Design a protein with these regions (language model features):
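Short beta-strand scaffold segments in enzyme catalytic cores
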Residues: 9-15, 120-125, 130-132, 217-220
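Compact, glycine/acidic-enriched structural inserts
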Residues: 83-112
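Extended amphipathic alpha-helical segments with heptad-repeat/coiled-coil character used for oligomerization
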Residues: 126, 131-150
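Flexible, glycine-rich surface segments
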Residues: 145-207, 211-214
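Conserved small/polar residues in nucleotide/adenosyl-binding loops
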Residues: 263-269
Length: 273
């Protein structure tokens, strides 16, 4: 397993034009020995309730009570922008705590003088607005959603020639979405999740015998506040949450993937992904 493969991630923000429903999917690929978990923070006077997933007290992605979703993915390293830098704290948690829309998230990035030089970020909200934020060439680049979908992989959309492109996983997701839309079938969270069938990575060892692959895949119905997470590509043991209920709780929750009580669910189709 090549290091860049182990670090590969796939993110989708999708709006069903027939129903207006909004979905988000993320496949987090990394080394499988990390202590990954879900963190749910309760609402307070100045902070929104929010759920994020990641490890080492750092949010890799998540969503808050207002339906603001974010995720990040590694990209080829770029020159740092003068006066800006990478975050020194849990940036994702801070954004989910304080922002309710894509525009507000962008304002926080600017206020905090954040310019990631080794990754980019996708933000999407409940209104149907979404953007991928990238930094290179001394400035911030915004790739706004221009139809009903936004896909993020590990290459810079504003500068694909920088590396990690072309990407067959990116092409596969786009192709499967096009097939789904042209089929005339009703679109739901399960079918949107199926577009990641070739984007996930089964466990494989690298030259140092360290296992890498898809740690978890999250499926979010932003409109209806539904959250499903598959750990290590399991289609039987799932974390299934009603976000409205979880965000109404008054205490912090931490769900470690190795110890959490999973739900066994018979799905309408055989696989989520």
């Amino acid at each position: 397993l090549h290091p860049t493969q182990a670090l590969s991630c796939s993110v989708l923000y999708y709006k069903d034009l027939s129903t207006g429903k909004i979905y988000a999917v993320n496949a987090e690929d990394y080394y499988l020995d990390v202590d990954a978990y879900i963190q749910i923070e309760p609402k307070s006077k100045r902070k929104f309730a929010r759920l994020w997933y990641g490890w080492d007290d750092f949010a890799q992605g998540g969503i808050n009570e207002h339906g603001l979703f974010f995720d990040a993915a590694i990209t080829p390293e770029q020159q740092k922008i003068k006066g800006y830098g990478n975050p020194r704290n849990n940036l994702g948690d801070k954004i989910l705590a304080l922002a309710s829309t894509v525009e507000e998230a962008l304002e926080i990035l600017e206020k905090e003088k954040i310019a990631l030089n080794k990754s980019h970020m996708l933000f999407g909200d409940r209104t149907g607005q979404a953007v991928i934020v990238e930094w290179f060439g001394g400035e911030r680049k915004l790739r706004w959603i221009d139809d009903n979908k936004l896909v993020m992989k590990n290459f810079l959309l504003s500068k694909p020639e920088a590396g990690n492109h072309p990407d067959f996983r990116y092409n596969s997701i786009i192709h499967r979405i096009n097939e789904l839309e042209s089929s005339g079938q009703e679109i739901n969270l399960n079918k949107i999740g199926n577009t990641f069938g070739l984007a996930v990575q089964p466990a494989r060892a690298d030259k140092n015998k360290r296992l890498g692959g898809t740690i978890y895949t999250s499926f979010i119905d932003i409109t209806d506040n539904k959250f499903v997470l598959s750990y290590r590509l399991s289609n039987d043991d799932l974390v299934i949450l009603d976000l409205k209920e979880e965000f109404a709780r008054s205490k912090r929750q931490t769900m470690n993937f190795e110890t959490v009580s999973y739900t066994h669910l018979t799905l309408p189709t055989k696989r989520i992904v």
